[in-house]
Amino acid sequence: MKLDVIKLDGGKAGDIELSEDLFGLEPRADILHRVVRWQRNNAQAGTHKVKTRSETSYSTKKIYRQKGTGGARHGDRNAPIFRKGGIYKGPTPRSHGHDLTKKFRKLGLRHALSAKAKAGELVVIENAEAEGKTAALAKQVANLGWKRALVIDGAAVNEGFARAAKNIEGLDILPSMGANVYDILKRDTLVLTKSAVEALEARLK
């Protein structure tokens, strides 16, 4: 498939042939869902913790004698039945991550790129270079109509562009190796540089 290549000032800079294997697939929601779930679960801290009966510090004294009171039998006030007592089978720190094969992760990335291409939310620019002035880049981004955009560059992100984009709300920048399904789907517009297209095609072929 062919797509126009533009400059940051909005001018045309030719066109580019995109691989059908990367940008021409029929997007599958089940594949995208599995990869996003894998990403988010691996990112989850899993630090939730409550105290069990052995960890609470209240009292270890038996609250009253075993027999003769007419009440139920009880030990100390650390029991889960009492206020300030320990929690029975509560959450403990653990990893929420699970495995997903490299082959499937690559497939998910191809489907994410294809989803953006099919939705008309894919833009290819000649390069992502700037002098480091936020105001100038913000004006260009506004003129291009990018409200929530992810810019993916080649192997390395241009320092001036990264510095200029740092304070622009809704604009994220990643090198080609940082391209991932969650960040691609999270933004309304996916912007690829020509070097990013080449790097992604080499990575996902």
Curated annotation (Swiss-Prot):
Keywords: Ribonucleoprotein, Ribosomal protein, RNA-binding, rRNA-binding. One of its GO terms (biological process) is translation. The keyword NADP does not apply. GO terms for molecular function: rRNA binding; structural constituent of ribosome. One of its GO terms (cellular component) is ribosome. It comes from the Bacteria. NCBIfam families: rplD_bact. Part of the 50S ribosomal subunit. One of the primary rRNA binding proteins, this protein initially binds near the 5'-end of the 23S rRNA. It is important during the early stages of 50S assembly. It makes multiple contacts with different domains of the 23S rRNA in the assembled 50S subunit and ribosome. Forms part of the polypeptide exit tunnel. PANTHER family: 50S RIBOSOMAL PROTEIN L4, LARGE RIBOSOMAL SUBUNIT PROTEIN UL4M. Belongs to the universal ribosomal protein uL4 family. This is Large ribosomal subunit protein uL4. The gene is rplD.
